[in-house]
Amino acid sequence: MSNDKKNAFPIKLTHSAADQVKKLISSQDYAEKLDLKLRVYILGGGCGGFQYKFILDDQVSNDDCVIESNGAIVVVDPMSLQYLFGGIIDYYEGLEGSKFLVVNPNAKGVCSCGSSFNI
């Protein structure tokens, strides 16, 4: 994977999100797979029309965009990237639980749960 592709990635990860990714990867469940990255992708569905999905993945395709941000690596496929361009991924902990959140400048509307959006 070229450094140009890695450096051109248009999504940022907050320190809180990066810390959580590193914590998850170093947990006992993934101790033998330290090459994991946070894959962020978009699926149709949810009350807003599109949903954000997050998984830990050790696979990177040639057409994936990859960035290292605050010590964690994020991977996004080209289709999802068009919807996430310029976004910021954060990690939130509150009374109702904890989750990754996306601040997406492309979203015209976001549902109250924050997990789905429309364009």
From Swiss-Prot:
Binds 1 iron-sulfur cluster per subunit. Pfam families: Fe-S_biosyn. Its cofactor is iron-sulfur cluster. It comes from the Bacteria. Homodimer. Required for insertion of 4Fe-4S clusters for at least IspG. This is Iron-sulfur cluster insertion protein ErpA. It comes from Blochmanniella floridana. The gene is erpA.
